[in-house]
């Protein structure tokens, strides 16, 4: 295994050194696969074996915004296709709920220990996507907690991983080159569905001058956390995956009140003592479920449950409300998918969110609900993921040299864009500089313009 550790620093005033959010800290080559390797694995898995490209697999570490304004180091996995002459869309895939740190994508890589990552990777990257798997804040790090279902943490993790992968492209240009274009796709299911919509919200509200989202496909996420999800838990006598509830509640307590928060103010004595160790990253969800009561709210003190039920200003009501994702209007193409038989995350989350966005004037939004006959949360996941991926394929553009506008074609529009670059030195993205530099001399010149013009003529 080839291990490469890179420390990238920037000089500021007075000669000081400083990192910044999105900076690539470390990268490690986990391996590579040929087209034949991928086709064989997909065939064994019973999946239609298609692979247009071989791929490389790297885990990375990068900086993101952390608590108190300090930087935090996160991990992730990136798989990219092999081509010296094409630029590919970035597809950020947000994984579903996991509790044990050993399940982080950067740690499992492409292995049977993480079949979600393995299958999504081998379906997407060999077909021309640079596929990213953010670990998420705190996940995979035994020294930290993962702030489960907190919107801002996902937004930061995903934005900064995209930045870091773009830096990785620069760092690998001699050893293992790959090139991104200007397309960015978001896709995720369950926790990943929530993370997808949270990242879309964060990008559109705070980073729209840096990123344009091509498509966003949130699936089966608890977007209406303070409404649909609260009503659901207060109305049901039991819940199939009870560990989800304390995972949210402990995460919100630690995230907003600090890791020294007094759990005995909220939970019955046994749970106040036990929950911190259950969510220390060494246990699996099924282990925690085996300890939980059928009704997960039974872990709360009676007075805390009563206050939560009747007081809109209760801490949990406020934190859940702050992380409800209905307070904006998506501008990017947004495609919701959910199963009507979902027994973990009710489909009303998607319905309420869709209705709210439509009422607010969202220009390009869709909701697909799948029949109860397709099963519950886990059973309907492959159907949702397949539908979302097919939407993304419809938008996908793989860009040859000369395709400055990322539409997968070389047209007169690309000629005009390159001419403007040469004549007036207008601002271009990193991809557009690559696309316009046909003779690879690190500049845009009349020779590049002639090359693009010839491509249009032919």
Predicted regions and their residues:
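Short, surface-exposed "cap/lid" segments of acyl-processing enzymes
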Residues: 67-75, 79-126
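Conserved alpha/beta-hydrolase "acid-adjacent" motif
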Residues: 343-349
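Cellulosome-associated attachment modules in secreted, modular CAZymes
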Residues: 398-458
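Accessory cap/linker subdomain of secreted extracellular hydrolases
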Residues: 219-327
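Alpha/beta-hydrolase active-site loop
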Residues: 148-172
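Gly/Ser-rich "nucleophile elbow"/oxyanion-hole loop immediately N-terminal to the catalytic nucleophile
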Residues: 80-87, 164-187, 206-211
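Short beta-strand/loop motif that positions the catalytic acidic residue
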Residues: 335-342
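Catalytic-loop region of hydrolases
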Residues: 19-86
């Amino acid at each position: 295994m080839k291990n490469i550790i890179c420390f990238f620093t920037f000089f500021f005033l007075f000669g000081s050194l400083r990192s910044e959010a999105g900076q690539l800290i470390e990268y490690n080559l986990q391996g590579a696969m040929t087209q034949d390797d991928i086709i064989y694995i997909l065939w064994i898995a019973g999946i239609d074996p298609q692979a247009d490209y071989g791929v490389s697999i790297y885990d990375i570490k990068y900086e993101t915004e952390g608590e108190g304004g300090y930087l935090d180091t996160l991990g992730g996995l990136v798989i990219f296709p092999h081509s010296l002459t094409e630029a590919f869309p970035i597809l950020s895939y947000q994984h579903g709920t996991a509790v044990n740190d050993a399940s982080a994508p950067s740690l499992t890589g492409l292995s049977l220990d993480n079949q979600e990552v393995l299958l999504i990777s081998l379906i997407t990257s060999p077909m021309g996507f640079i596929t990213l798997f953010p670990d998420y804040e705190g996940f995979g790090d035994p020294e930290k907690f993962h702030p489960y279902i907190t919107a801002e943490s996902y937004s930061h993790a995903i934005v900064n991983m995209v930045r870091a992968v773009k830096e990785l492209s620069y760092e690998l240009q001699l050893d293992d080159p790959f090139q991104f274009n200007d397309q960015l796709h978001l896709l995720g299911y369950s926790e990943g569905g929530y993370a997808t919509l949270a990242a879309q919200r964060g990008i559109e509200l705070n980073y729209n001058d840096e990123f344009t989202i091509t498509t966003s496909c949130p699936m089966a996420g608890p977007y209406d956390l303070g409404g649909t999800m609260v009503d659901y838990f207060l109305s049901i006598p039991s819940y199939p995956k009870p560990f989800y509830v304390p995972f949210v509640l402990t995460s919100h307590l630690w995230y907003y009140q600090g890791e020294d928060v007094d759990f005995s103010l909220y939970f019955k004595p046994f749970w106040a003592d036990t929950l911190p160790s259950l969510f220390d990253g060494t246990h699996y969800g099924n282990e925690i479920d085996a300890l939980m009561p059928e009704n997960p709210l039974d872990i709360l003190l009676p007075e805390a449950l009563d206050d939560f039920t009747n007081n809109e200003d209760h801490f949990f009501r406020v934190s859940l409300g702050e992380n409800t994702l209905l307070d904006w209007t998506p501008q990017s193409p947004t495609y919701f998918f959910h199963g009507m038989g979902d027994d973990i995350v009710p489909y009303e989350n998607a319905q309420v969110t869709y209705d709210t966005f439509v009422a607010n004037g969202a220009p390009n939004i869709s909701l697909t609900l799948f029949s109860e006959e397709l099963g519950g949360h886990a059973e309907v996941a492959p159907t949702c993921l397949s539908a979302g991926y097919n939407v993304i394929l419809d938008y996908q553009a793989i860009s040859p040299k000369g395709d400055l506008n990322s539409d997968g074609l070389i047209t007169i529009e690309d000629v005009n864009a390159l001419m403007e670059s040469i004549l007036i030195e207008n601002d271009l993205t990193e991809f557009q500089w690559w696309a316009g530099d046909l003779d690879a001399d690190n500049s845009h010149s009349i020779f590049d313009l002639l090359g693009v013009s010839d491509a249009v003529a032919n």
